[in-house]
């Protein structure tokens, strides 16, 4: 894990292992090992921040939230839910070396047209952007 950059998020205690010649990280929410990629590094830290610092219960943090958009399957990185499992925040994570630009925002807004979360968070672990969706869609 030394090859991944320090992020602008609180440190997370990650459980890592080399399996099948690849670096893997334990996903405590889903109970499985995941390939550790630069984007997954950011996602693990965001999840740690949401649960450990903000206090969001694990049951309200949905990873790789699947939905259909225009007839194709899509996945939002993280969706935080509230009462009745209604989406409160859609989180789009990128690797630390990926700029958070208009294309990333457009992607999140497209996703949110289906997810209908009240808030959108875009992050590459270094920079974080938060948006309030006026009517839950844009």
Which sequence ranges carry the predicted segments?
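A short, conserved, highly charged catalytic patch centered on acidic carboxylates
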Residues: 1-119, 126-138
